[in-house]
Design a protein with these regions (language model features):
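Sequence/structural signature of beta-propeller domains
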Residues: 2-8, 13, 20, 26-317
Length: 317
């Protein structure tokens, strides 16, 4: 797969966000950055403070210049938002509408969200401990239909990644412990069955270690993960020295995944992962590709500085 790591990005001052209030940035055109560097424009706030970050995201629609998405937040206390609907105009504003949570106990530390292929309007969110929530959204809330636990959880695993891919008539899942500094991320992959009526069922699990090519200090090797239509693994990585930063991030192509012809999954990790973009000053924890485009959306959890969204070219057509 050939893609330019040319990044389009923009800077916006943070703006206060109340529930369902649009947060705007100055309207300005995104300007290209040199390959491998960070543009300093276009970031749009999703709110101020620790509870307003974005820890996972899926795009649900696109209407002209506006992108619709669902985002999860890694909040832990009662009364704090876990899931929100976002209408986002790149470089201009984000309208964030918190959603409720029904059908299960309120999750703690949601870190990823993914669409369920073949089940319109259905999603899976996964918390850092490895608990998954299969749900639909309606009437201002998530309605949980099933919970499950990821298989083969290793000691010390802290999950920030969960993605699904449907290829050759077979469904597979990839999830990952984030890793930390000298401890690499562990990628897990397995076939998965998600019947209309019944529980999630995982097949045999394949594991591979993964180290981010960038950043190199205080690094989480896998802060989010998405799978392209061709099976490429797009991974975010982040430097997190503490709640006040300074943060640094990258998006890189880590390898490939595909259900194999038997009952397993072929998981390949690149020897030298390709950095597709670097993003200084932000802690990227969410990736989402736009359908039919090389552009994707980045979401950040910048802790005390809140959260932000931006677009960049890191996807394949």
């Amino acid at each position: 797969m050939h893609r330019s790591p040319l990044i389009r990005a923009c800077l916006a001052g943070a703006a206060a966000l109340g529930a369902g209030v649009a947060v705007a940035a100055p309207a300005q055109a995104a300007t290209p950055a040199a390959p491998g560097t960070t543009g300093d424009h276009g970031w749009v706030s999703t709110g101020d403070g620790m509870t307003s970050g974005v820890s996972g995201m899926v795009v649900t629609g696109r209407h002209g210049g506006e992108i619709d998405a669902l985002v999860v937040r890694d909040n832990k206390k009662a009364g704090e938002n876990r899931l929100a609907r976002v209408s986002y105009r790149p470089g201009r504003q984000a309208d964030v509408r918190p959603l409720g949570w029904q059908g299960s106990s309120t999750p703690v530390d949601l870190e990823s969200i993914e669409k369920v292929p073949g089940h319109e309007g259905e999603y899976i969110a996964v918390a850092s401990e490895g608990k998954g929530y299969r749900f639909q959204v309606g009437h201002g809330a998530a309605h949980v239909r099933e919970t499950f636990t990821l298989p083969d959880i290793g000691e010390g695993d802290n999950f920030e990644d969960f993605a699904l891919t449907y290829r050759h008539g077979k469904l597979a899942a990839v999830w990952a412990d984030r890793g930390q500094d000298e401890r690499p991320s562990t990628l897990y992959a397995a076939r998965i069955s998600l019947p209309e009526h019944g529980a999630a069922d995982f097949g045999a699990v394949t594991e591979q270690e993964l180290r981010a090519p960038y950043p190199t200090e205080n690094v989480r090797h896998a802060s989010d993960l998405k799978i392209t239509d061709s099976g490429s693994l797009l991974v975010g990585s982040a430097s997190d020295p503490g709640d006040d930063g300074p943060f640094d991030s990258a998006v890189y192509e880590a390898g490939t995944v595909s259900p194999d012809r038997s009952h397993g999954v072929s998981l390949h990790v690149a020897k030298d992962p390709e950095v597709l973009g670097k993003f200084a000053g932000h802690k990227i924890e969410a990736l989402a590709c736009l359908p039919g485009s090389r552009e994707g959306v980045l979401g950040t959890d910048d802790e005390n500085a809140g959260g932000a969204l931006n677009t960049a070219r890191f996807c394949e057509r």
